[in-house]
Amino acid sequence: MSEAFDFDTYIMAHYEKHPPLLHFAGESREEWYVWQQQLRARLLDLMEPFPEQVPLEARVVEHREQFGVHYEKVVYTTAEDVQVPAWLLIPEDVAQPAPGIICLHGHGIYGKDNVAHVDYGEEDRARAIERANYDYGLQLAKRGFVTLCPDARGFGERSEDFRRYGNRDGCNVNGIKTFLFGMNLMALNTWDDMRGLDYLASRPEVDADRLGCIGLSFGGTRSMYLAAVDERVKAADVVCYLTTFKQYALTQGNFCGSQFVPGILKYAEVADVCGLVAPRPLLIESGIQDGGFPIAAAREAYAHLESIYAAAQVSESLWRDEFDGGHQFSGAKAFDFFNAYL
C-alpha cells in the first residue's frame, strides 16, 4: 500500500470523487430554469452576509477633459464605513440618457485608473495600459456609453500600498482577513459593484434600463459574479477569466482570496456561475496565448456554458471572442456586442 502523503493528490482525488452538486446537466428549458433558481439561491447563501444598504451620498470631487470625453472623479458610499472612488466617463455629443457600463479592473496597483486611461503622465502606468489594452472604460465611452470605473477593495486608492506585504499577494491577504470575520472579499466587492450600478442608474445621463458590465482577469471574475446575481445587468463581457476551478485553482494555483466564494466548488464550476447570466447576453473573451488562463480549460468551460444557453433556448445570446493574444482585452467584438444589446 502506497502512502497518501501528498496534499495535491488528495485535493484532486476529492475533486474527482465529489463533482459539484449543482453542475448543470439538463437539456430542456424547464430543467434550466429550475437549476438556475437553485444555483442562484445557493450562491447568494454562500456570499452572505452582504452589508446593509446605506444612502449613496455621492459627490463629484474632480473634473477633467481628455480624449474628447468628460471625466468626473466621484466618491459614493456603499456600506457603513465604506466609500468607493471611481471615474465616471461621459461621452460628448451623445444622445442622453445613454446606456451605462460598469468597467471593472483586474489585479494591479493602479486599479480604476488603467481602465479609465488616467496615467498621470507616468510611463509605468502608460505601459500597463498599452500592454493589456486595458482602457476599455475609455474605449467604450468614446463609442457613446457612459462608463463607471471604480476601485475594488484593496486596490488603487483603496489601499495604502498594494505591495506592503512584500512577496505576499496583497489581495490574498485581504481575502484571508475577511474570512476571519465570516465574510468573503468576493461578496464585498460584488456588493460594491452592485452599488456602482445604483450610482450609474442615478445619473441623469444614463438610461437605468440599459446597464452592462465588463472586466478583465479579476475584473472578469467580478463581471461574472455581478451579472450572475444582479439581473439589472442586461449584457456582460467576461474577459480572460472563463476557465475551470480544476485548472486555474486546483492545478495552477492562479487565484487569490479575493477571487472566489468559499464553498462554491461544492456546488458549481466556473461555467455554471457564468450560466446564471442566461438568458441575458454574455460575451466571453479568451486569449489563445493566455498563460494564466490556458485556452484548453477556457474551451472546456465554454462548451459547458454553451449547453446552458442551448437549454435556455438563447444560444444566439452567447458570444465568443477567442483571439490570437494573451491576457488582455481584445475589443474585436465587445463594441458590436454592447451596441446590439444595450
Model-found features: residue ranges?
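N-terminal targeting or regulatory segments adjacent to alpha/beta-hydrolase or S9 domains
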Residues: 1-70, 78
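Glycine-rich nucleophile elbow surrounding the catalytic serine of serine-hydrolase chemistry
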Residues: 215-227
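C-terminal catalytic histidine-bearing segment of alpha/beta-hydrolase fold enzymes
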Residues: 303-342
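Short beta-strand/loop motif that positions the catalytic acidic residue
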Residues: 277, 284-286
